[in-house]
Structure formats: structure tokens, C-alpha cells
Amino acid sequence: MFLKIKNIPKVNWSSEKPYNFKPKFSTLFFCCFGLMLFGLGEGLLIVSFTGASPWSVLAQGLSLNVNLSIGILTFLISVTVLIFWIPLGQKPGIATILNALIIAIMIDLCIKFVPTPSNYINQLILAVISVTTVGIGGGIYLVANLGAGPRDGLMVGLQKLTNFPIATVRGTLEISVVSVGWYLGGTVGIGTILFAFGIGPCVALGLFLVNRLFN
């Protein structure tokens, strides 16, 4: 059962180590493809207008209590998460850089070309699609083993520390983050809740599918 997956699978296009700036073409291709799906999913959540992602809610909540913008706080949160990588033994790679670039581009493209659904039911459907897309995309790029974005690296590090399933670790992390953000005054929508509870299982599903297809 994919919900019990504890480790990032290794396939024939996985990099031997995260710190690899000369990966095989197939490794780089799947890394970028996964990140494109990830960014598309993030963009679809924004377009759905059903609520922000948990980490955005945290940044919003913090902005209501300190004299800093949501953008600056989002950056500071990412830096803080990266600092937590150190005791967890996580190492950056080319995907750590590509994560920021590709996801940002895909979000902008999605916002520009994907219209917001005209009724709430379709907005909810789009939110479900967005969470699934983020999870599967995340699973694909993590299997490439070229490093991870701040939140995904934290998830992997905490999984190794606790030995809990990836779905459990990611779900607990996202639910904790959105809870703190909501407590601080951040706005929570149904899309936020779907993301917080659904992203863990969806990442695990992505890992499971890649493992089944390539092993």
C-alpha cells in the first residue's frame, strides 16, 4: 500500500547522489518534468480560489503579527527550513535551485492561461486536481535524487529521523504549519484543508507509481 512507503525509491534514472551537477539527461528530464507538474499544481490551487497552501497561510499569519510582507516572510520561512536541514543531514542539489525557478514559471503560466471555474463545485474539483498534481510531481522529482526544495527536504529528513511513512510525515508537517498559520490569523479555505490533508498521500502515490513503472 502506497501510504506505507517510507523511502524514496531508486530507479534507473535516479542520480547516485544529490550533489550532482552533471546528471544524466534522463535524470534531469524527469526532475524537470516532476517540478513542472509540481508548479502546475501550485498554480491550479491559486486559480481555484479555494484557499492558499499551508505555508502561505503561515506566512500570512506571521505578516499580521510582525511588520514584514508575506513575500519577505515566505523567503525567511524557506531559509529557516533550510537551516533545519543541517541537523537532519539533508544536502542541496541542482533540484534545490530548479525547484524555485521552474515552479515560479509554471505558477505564472498557470495563472495567465487557466481561467478560474465559474462555479464552486468546479473550483473544488480543480483544487483536488491541484493537490494530486503537486503530489505526483513531487514524487517524480524526488526520485530523480538531485536534491529537493526546502519543504520536501524537510519532509525527507524528518522521515529518516522518525522512520514514519512519508505520507504521515508530510501530512503532519502540513497540518501543523496550517494550524499555526490559522492561529496567527491566516485565512484557511477548503483548498487549504484539502492540501494539508491530501498532499502526504499524493506524494506517496507519486513515489509508488514511479516505482511500479520503472522497477
Predicted regions: what they are:
Residues 2-215:
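Core subunits and conserved enzymes of cellular information-processing
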